[in-house]
């Protein structure tokens, strides 16, 4: 038996144990939604007495739910804000942070779009409304239709920070309530552009290579390039919980961070917190 397979088997056996409490609620980031759903199903198969419900809505929605006690774990693609942390502490709750994976953010366009790559500066100009036609970046003579996540999304905030340099998005940007809505809109609109987590990529949209050195080198979004640190748009993904609730949520968190959980993380299209991508 290979060392990796043995480690995976031991990891599974360790988590075939009774859950401390039978039900957990997890809410928040759409980026983390597919990963958490897959891992929750895997965990419940190993622990039939456990019940985990997972819903999206965005990082801000998840953290708000944690603050008002309507979720046990908040999924977030951004760090908790100082104001959110302060509000929890004022209510005598202590927020705890766990990194469960990393994610590469992919820039997507319609598959028929001839453009294959963009610089960070070009992306900034597009999402700020300074570049409005694809011919300005080597494409066809067609209007650029720009899609973004809503302001409650951690991905919205990360893109603003990493790509726009904390400058404002264009006022006429089309805000989507979920990542799936961006995928669907870009798929159906030939002049569209948007951004999604790597795990959401499919054959119906085209991911672009990105340059963060003013066009000298372009790198395609992939797990391998993210692990090698050659792809520039990578961020950590978080779970937040109330410290008083740690006994309830810790078994599932430990499972995610185990060898079995991290192998599944890689298979779904996220970057593990371990080095398991290196064979």
Positions of PLM-derived features:
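Generic N-terminal leader/processing signal
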Residues: 1-2, 25
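Enrichment for repetitive, rod-forming helical segments
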Residues: 10-14, 34
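Hydrophobic h-region of N-terminal signal peptides that target proteins for export
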Residues: 13-22
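Exported/periplasmic ABC-transporter solute-binding proteins
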Residues: 22-279
